[in-house]
Amino acid sequence: MDVVPPTDSPEVQQWIQEVMNSGVNIPSFNPTVAGGCPANPAAAANSTRCWWTCGGCTRSTDITTCPQKYNWGLTYDDGPSHYTPDLLNYLTQVNLSTTFFVVGSRVIQFPQLLQEEYMLGHQIAVHTWSHPPLTTLTNEQIIAELGWSKKVIQDTIGVVPLMMRPPYGDIEFVFSFFVHRIYGTDDYFNGAVTVCVLFARP
């Protein structure tokens, strides 16, 4: 299931067209290759690309710290899975809420678990469709990853997700354009409190 979706489906073509029609000039960079920063020295050195993963590049508009000392967020990535029921039972026992950053293709495998997470009062957010490092994808593939993830979550629980976390924290400047267009937020950081959730490490 963890396969990057094709970009030639009618749905993805529509999402691509919507992004193109947004009036925003979205830069296009060559995808990186497997191996991270050492395997991609030119991309890592490109300040225009602003590859956060390789150098911590941020923009002046990015929120990168929690607004108050000792703020933190409890989060879980990569589900739902067969481990989710035990985790939900534990969270209920200790009266904790969390944010589940879910992988779209796994929602198809375990739709009832996503519904249970949501009905128990937990936040649901996007962790892409197939869990790839996003800089290894083309712009069109990123649109497909985000679009299908948004759709499967909305189809399963009736709610549009407002947050997302990129797998492996792999992001660059261009990524915010897609998140704004597909999710309607100014960035994948949906406010200062959310950034505490996004960067929390369970």
Model-derived segments and spans:
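N-terminal, immediately post-signal peptide pro-regions of secreted/luminal proteins
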Residues: M1-P31
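His/Asp/Glu-enriched short active-site or ligand-binding loop at hydrolase and phosphoryl-transfer sites
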Residues: S176, H180-P202
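Active-site beta->alpha N-cap acidic-glycine motif
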Residues: M20-P133, Q141-P166, I171-E172
